[in-house]
């Protein structure tokens, strides 16, 4: 029995897709356990770049099973489009499995998402308007429609009718907006359900059977720990649990079956949307990092906010997600900077603190305390080992590992697969 969880340790966009794809080579099952099509991951496979939002990275390996777990909220329309996109590119999808317990995103979720965000005005959260939050709200309120319900025409019609009555009251009376008609949704989305029916099953059985048979299972998180609804910068968070603990809820695999947790981070920090970001850069250095790192959202296309590496954030992520191994990406983006900085602590009202505050008021008063290190000018995109790195780059990597308190198992010096370098095999440690 071998299992590895891949989690983002910052605010998403850390390069999880590439690392998941890299680790997938030695896995037999790859599963997603939370989030929806608000998450975007970019994968290069056989020289082609693919952008996926719902389907796990393992789909490119015909002999491996890819799982969308029960903790994922699925927009059937988006999923059907993504399947068609893969088929157009001659990528087989018959190795996909979708949980019958996963909840469904419907048009009224997306409309409610937009209306609620607009109503917040300056206090908006920066949602991707994909209906993720409202779908999870319905799930918690026990009025959600699951994949199993979508496939049953009678049950789907009954629950859709009940939900539309409630949602339309909100649209008309609270937001002064138009109602959504039953016929605008029912036949179209029932048909989407029929198109994905061949993939639907009890994925908890598949995952547990695989682990019990001694197979290697890789769990792929979306977003990042700092967007976790419990452990992140609430309320500027997603509506699910990207932390490693979310695996047990979102996949139906017990915690005793989790072996390793790989935390993925960039050599700097980025964030899409609103919310606290203590090390954010607003100067030329920030513009350089954004330009060189091509920091634009996979899902939204929005420019990402960028800043220095924050070890306070990383230690928080390590603690709440039980990170055992670190994967450090995008070191090459910092090449050419005369000085690189690492945030080692915050100064709050004249005192040093080393933990990430829950209070947004406290966070707004936190000033990052930096350790400055000399930068490097060399092109490192061809480096294969730590010894190949310039001394200053190597020292930077070592210092990050020291401050976070986790050994680095892989490091990346570019977007391509062959630019990801293994220092210690995670699978070999199990």
UniProtKB/Swiss-Prot annotation:
The record's Gene Ontology cellular component field reads: cytoplasm
Instruction: Report keywords, A-Z.
Output: Cytoplasm, GTP-binding, Ligase, Magnesium, Metal-binding, Nucleotide-binding, Purine biosynthesis
GO BP of this protein: 'de novo' AMP biosynthetic process; IMP metabolic process
Q: What does the Swiss-Prot or TrEMBL cofactor note state?
A: Binds 1 Mg(2+) ion per subunit.
Q: Which PROSITE patterns match?
A: ADENYLOSUCCIN_SYN_1 (PS01266), ADENYLOSUCCIN_SYN_2 (PS00513)
Q: Where does IMP bind?
A: 13-16, 38-41, 128, 142, 223, 238, 302
Tell me, what is one Gene Ontology molecular-function annotation carried by this entry? Answer: magnesium ion binding
Cofactor(s) listed: Mg(2+)
Fetch the SUPFAM superfamilies from UniProt: P-loop containing nucleoside triphosphate hydrolases (SSF52540)
Q: Per its UniProt record, what InterPro entries does this chain match?
A: Adenylosuccin_syn_GTP-bd (IPR018220), Adenylosuccin_syn_Lys_AS (IPR033128), Adenylosuccinate_synth_dom1 (IPR042109), Adenylosuccinate_synth_dom2 (IPR042110), Adenylosuccinate_synth_dom3 (IPR042111), Adenylosuccinate_synthetase (IPR001114), P-loop_NTPase (IPR027417)
Catalytic center at which residues? 13 (proton acceptor), 41 (proton donor)
Give me the reactions it catalyses. Answer: IMP + L-aspartate + GTP = N(6)-(1,2-dicarboxyethyl)-AMP + GDP + phosphate + 2 H(+)
Q: Which domain of life is it from?
A: Bacteria
Q: Which residues bind substrate?
A: 298-304
Report the subcellular localization.
Answer: Cytoplasm
List the pathway annotation: Purine metabolism; AMP biosynthesis via de novo pathway; AMP from IMP: step 1/2
Q: Which residues bind GTP?
A: 12-18, 40-42, 304, 330-332, 412-414
Its job = Plays an important role in the de novo pathway of purine nucleotide biosynthesis. Catalyzes the first committed step in the biosynthesis of AMP from IMP.
This protein's assembly is summarised as: Homodimer.
Instruction: Tell me which family the UniProt entry assigns to this protein.
Output: Belongs to the adenylosuccinate synthetase family.
Q: Sorted alphabetically, which NCBIfam families does this protein's record hold?
A: PRK01117.1 (NF002223), purA (TIGR00184)
Q: What is this protein called?
A: Adenylosuccinate synthetase
């Amino acid at each position: 029995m071998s299992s590895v969880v891949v989690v983002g340790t910052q605010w998403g966009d850390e390069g999880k897709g590439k690392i998941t794809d890299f680790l997938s080579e030695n896995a037999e099952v790859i599963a997603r356990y939370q989030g929806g099509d608000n998450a975007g991951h970019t994968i290069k496979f056989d020289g082609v770049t693919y952008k996926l939002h719902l389907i796990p990275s393992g789909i490119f390996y015909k002999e491996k099973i890819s799982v969308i777990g029960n903790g994922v909220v699925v927009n059937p329309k988006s999923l059907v489009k993504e399947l068609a996109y893969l088929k157009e590119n001659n990528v087989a999808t018959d190795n996909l499995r979708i949980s019958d317990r996963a909840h469904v995103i419907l048009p009224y979720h997306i409309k409610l998402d937009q209306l609620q965000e607009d109503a917040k005005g300056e206090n908006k959260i920066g949602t991707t308007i994909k209906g993720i939050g409202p779908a999870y709200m319905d799930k918690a309120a026990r009025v959600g429609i699951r994949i199993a319900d979508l496939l049953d025409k009678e049950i789907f019609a009954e629950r859709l009718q009940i939900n539309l009555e409630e949602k339309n009251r909100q649209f008309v009376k609270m937001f002064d907006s138009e109602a959504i008609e039953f016929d605008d949704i029912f036949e179209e989305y029932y048909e989407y359900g029929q198109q994905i029916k061949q993939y639907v099953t009890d994925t908890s059985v598949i995952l547990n059977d695989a682990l019990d048979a001694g197979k290697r299972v890789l769990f792929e998180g979306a977003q990042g720990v700092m967007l976790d609804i419990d452990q992140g910068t609430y309320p500027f968070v997603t509506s699910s649990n990207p932390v490693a603990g979310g695996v047990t809820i979102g996949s139906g695999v017990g915690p005793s079956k989790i072996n390793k947790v790989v935390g993925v981070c960039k050599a700097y920090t980025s964030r899409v949307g609103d919310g606290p970001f203590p090390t954010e850069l607003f100067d030329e250095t920030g513009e350089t990092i954004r330009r060189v790192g091509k920091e634009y959202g996979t899902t939204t296309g929005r420019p990402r906010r960028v800043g220095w590496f924050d070890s306070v954030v990383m230690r928080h992520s390590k603690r709440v997600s039980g990170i055992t191994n670190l994967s450090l990406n995008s070191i090459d983006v910092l090449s050419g900077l005369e000085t690189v900085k690492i945030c080692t602590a915050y100064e709050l009202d004249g005192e040093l603190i080393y933990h990430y505050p829950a209070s947004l008021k406290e966070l707004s008063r936190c000033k990052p305390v930096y350790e400055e290190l000399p930068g490097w000018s060399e092109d490192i995109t061809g480096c294969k080992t730590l010894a190949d790195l310039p001394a200053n780059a190597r020292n930077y990597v070592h210092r990050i590992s020291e401050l976070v308190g986790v050994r680095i198992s892989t490091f990346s010096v570019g977007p391509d697969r062959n630019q990801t370098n293994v220092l210690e095999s995670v699978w070999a440690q199990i």
